[in-house]
Amino acid sequence: MNKADRLNQLLPNGRGVWIPIDHGASDFPIPGLTDTEGVIKSLVAAGVDGIVAQKGVVSHYQHLCEGSRTSMVIHFSVSTRHAGPDAANKVIVGHADEVIPRGGVGVSCQVNMGSPNEAAMIERMGQLSREALHHELPMFGMVLSLIHI
């Protein structure tokens, strides 16, 4: 499967419904996300196109998506609420070459605009994007603003 096929799988006809469940690495337990297997089974049954999750979740639960229209995207950015003033600094915890062996079809990472570490996060996103290019993987960015207008 090439990049275009993977992208079409995630965004049939250029559109898709994705659900991020990547929060467990940052802050667990979160109400509604404590039964990971049950959540994923529900999302697959609902016919979502993509589930965005941390790499361990994808490795452990990707088999639940087999034979369905649902694919998994590995979110490689992590920080925790316990990091205090550095909690918004998302670091990359893997590489694009892990995606296919773990059962994913794309990569995702996050940049928090307005964070003191914004430039470093953008640089990390660029490095992951380069890896995704070389592995024929779609790359998705979660770009959030920490600036309240």
Model-derived regions: residue spans:
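Anion (oxyanion) recognition and catalysis
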Residues: 44, 126-134
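N-terminal amphipathic alpha-helix/helix-capping segment at the start of soluble metabolic enzymes
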Residues: 1-22, 62-69
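Conserved, mostly hydrophobic/aromatic
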Residues: 19, 99, 142
